[in-house]
Amino acid sequence: RQRQMCIRDSKREEQERVQKMNILFFLTPKEEVAHVEEDDTLRQVVEKLEYHGYSAIPLLALDGKYIGTITEGDLLWEMKEKDFPDVHRMEKIRITDVKRRRDNEAVKISESMEDLFEKITNQNFVPVVDDNGIFIGIVTRKDVLLYLAGKLRNH
């Protein structure tokens, strides 16, 4: 019975610790995150995805606001609809002209960890924005899982 109380107390303490944490704990800042901007071309985005080995990348406005997420699937659909354009035509297609099928939903830096965890269950990364919608970085599912795995190992 005393062991159950200790376990309950330990769980409660862990919940309180998580509630006190904030999104900055997991943030990879914008300077360390590959992203594309609204005036980039289809070719530039394809090359950036290939170079970094990503399957999705944040799309930002020129003023730094988060617009959405471009995925490999978005690019494939665009190329199919344009009859697989050659490299020269790809240079003329602005990335904002590419239809996005699904955006990674952003979280505001001021939101709760629960909001972050809810979003990260369905996305490989969660874009993080300030209260004005300016992109400040991402939180990856991998970082959250590694943190949680470390917590489990320590208990």
Give a label for each model feature.
Residues 1-7:
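Short, small-residue-biased leader/transition segments that mark boundaries at the very start
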Residues 8-26, 84-91:
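Cyclic nucleotide-binding regulatory module and flanking cytosolic helices
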Residues 20-33, 90-103:
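Bateman (tandem CBS) regulatory domains
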Residues 35-54, 60-61, 105-123, 129-131, ...:
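The conserved cystathionine-beta-synthase
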Residues 40, 70, 93, 111, ...:
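Short beta-to-alpha loop/turn elements within the nucleotide-binding domains of ABC transporters
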Residues 54, 58, 66-82, 122, ...:
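Short beta->alpha transition motifs characteristic of CBS
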